[in-house]
Amino acid sequence: MRKTHLAIIAFILSVHLALPASGAPVTQSSNGWTVTADGEHGVLTVSRDGLGTVLNEVHLNLEGEHRLTRLKSWSAEKLGADRISIRSSEPRSAWEFKLRPEALEISTTSSEGLLTAETPAPPDRIVARLMDPQGAPVNWMMTPETKNGFGGIEFSAPSFLPRHNPDVMYFALGQVAGNSLHSLFDIKADAAIEFSEQTVMQRQPQHTGVLGVSIPVPGNTMVRVIPDYFTKVLGAPTYVPFDDSYFGRAPMVWDSWSSYYEDVREDDVVRNADWIAANLKAYGYEYVQLDDGYDRGPKGEHYWIGTWNQEKFPHGPKWLTDRIKSKGLRAGVWLVPSAYAGAVEQHPDWYLRYKKNGAIILDYDTPTLDSTNPEVLDFLKKEFTTLDDWGFEYYKFDGEHDFLKYVPGVDLDKIADKNVDPIVAYRNRLKLIRETIGPHRFIEGCPAGTPLDGIGYFNSAFTGEDPYNSWQGMYSVFSSINANAFLNHLVLYVMPGESDVEPPMSFAEATKRRPPSVVEAERNREEPLKGFGMTLEEARTVVSHVALSGVVYSLDSVLPELPEERVKLLKMTLPTMPIFPIDLFSRGTDMPMWDIFKHSTPDDYIHNYPEIIDLKVNAPSGVYDVAAVTNWRSGTTTRSLGFADKLGLNAQSSYVVFDFWAQKLLGVFKSKMDVSVEPHDTRVLLIHPLSLTPQVVGNSRHISGAYSIKSVAWEGAKNRLHGTSETVPGDDYTLWFYVPQGITLGQVHASAGKQEITARHEVTGNSLRVSFPGQREDVNWEIVFTAKSAM
């Protein structure tokens, strides 16, 4: 039956039939809905206030066992103030559209009713899997630090795992669809459009902004609109659609914190920046961010621009940013704008105070500023003007607690403006900073307790615990993606924490090669601490999950010490891609504090991490799925990957599967494949619908298969497949092709500009591998085939 629906949708998207006249159009508007029934052309249109068209070219059909009958002769009339009735005579049936406040209810006298239609689905109206209130309950918590560290208010919201495929997490690169996806999310309106679970939506390349929709009506069905989805359903404190015009994808940033802590020195930053410039800049890496440790006073207090440690940073901040920029990179800095130690004596009224007196010092050994005071805002404007003049382009704001709202004990009678709402005061401070540095500077908010009240001003938010440099330490990264990926690229970018890919290092060796503060921090979080680093399989899982979810790609490793095999993992997963979540719900914040690993190990830990990540791709490289299958346990496992059930693909089709990390074409599979995964490893499989002609199925450059390929085209008259790829100079580039039986290789050519490039090739069965050295200019490649029969 689903196969029939897909064929119907393809037909609808390609042609519209003119039907016999059956009366003038009838329009009914009620409860925000407008339905127009045009009997003359046999179509209906459905729109919704604030959303525009929801369904267009709606046709009424009756579905038999082997055929579909479109109703060609019907009449419509209004019933009361909120209904439209439709009656057909060939064949006889009756339909009713009832315009309810949050749903369009559709019913028919036939048990075989079927609506076929188009629904607008431009880039700002994305396919989605919505929260399922009938699924397993979990808790989304954004304030563990405020509650546990300061006795403050806890912010949390209920969420639910889906009943169907709770082990799969879906993402989109480009305008995609899937048979298991039945809803849309309108980014501008913060509204979801939910169809029935039996609905099939399909997108065709020639109609990228439209989805064909097939909606079974076995008696009745509903099309629901869920307004204020992020705020009222998910529990976000505010909703502002993310403007990605300056930052079209999540940034890639090296952060000094987890590998150096407050012991970081100028030489450490320069050494890592030089290494990034030499090894990763060509792959898209761009930011080098200095974290805490550059300005501490004798008691650990902070002065930010006032007192840089001259012993650790002898050349000062301007020299450092210039040095980073000279390498073609961008400089970033960590600070806590809500606190400052330099004005306690001169301006005591600048500070928040306890009801029992005394300045509030809750974090970073630094007193907290009163953001309702205009003089404080003037000070912050001067501070950020100076930082911007020094050349910083990336700002990590820590301690974003919004003390007035979430921390008890503040004496509200002693703040400058007693009438201002705490959230308004907090956002006014962020607004001033944003206006000072401009929209082209990146701000990472480290809420550490504030439930995302900075949405609209932050470009990203650090939404997890500080990671540390081991496999267990990376669980904070996985937990953050697991809990918060639904926010990514919709309201801000998710910064899940710094990733580490260093190889194993014993505790004894770490005491010699790492600062004491780093060793001590890890020992306090994990008992017993066996060492640092992780296996190659574990590192592969880290970079796979970060890259395929589209979150901020932040590194904390001592990069110059990485062996080539680890560097290769980074190169093959950079840069970040403009990925959107499909799953619009939290999978639960299940690790609030690091104490858990003092009593547990990852193998014992019960979590809701996905076993499969499914990135659906629609790009010049093709329309396909990237499935990452992860084994979280310490024993080898085999998982069954059902193409229809798990990935929402067509159950009747065959698929070509390419193993990205193994760089190997695995063959053609019909309905499923069994995937063997080593302990803590992730297999990444590119799954393409099988074509009758030669097709690109993978490349060596990027895990998505999409980044480097700018165009691909098949010319049947010439038996010629050609395309254009962006490559990295000096780095060997490989394309993998599937060649159907009966087709043989003729010639392979590659060129950059006017220069011919030597292209090597190897044929093994149906697999064709073509390699050539990377160039500064785009590489145009072509492959000519010969066929035993017409293609």
Task: List where the protein language model places each region.
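Aromatic-lined carbohydrate-binding/catalytic grooves of carbohydrate-active enzymes
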Residues: 250-254, 258-385, 392-415
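Carbohydrate-recognition beta-sandwich/jelly-roll modules
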Residues: 25-29, 35-287, 311, 394
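Solvent-exposed beta-hairpin/edge-strand motifs
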Residues: 131-142, 645-662, 738-754
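Carbohydrate-binding surface patches
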Residues: 167, 546-549, 554-556, 594-649, ...
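Glycan-recognition surfaces
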Residues: 346-378, 382, 424-564, 585-588, ...
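C-terminal beta-strand-rich structural cap/linker in extracellular carbohydrate-active enzymes
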Residues: 223, 668-706, 764-791
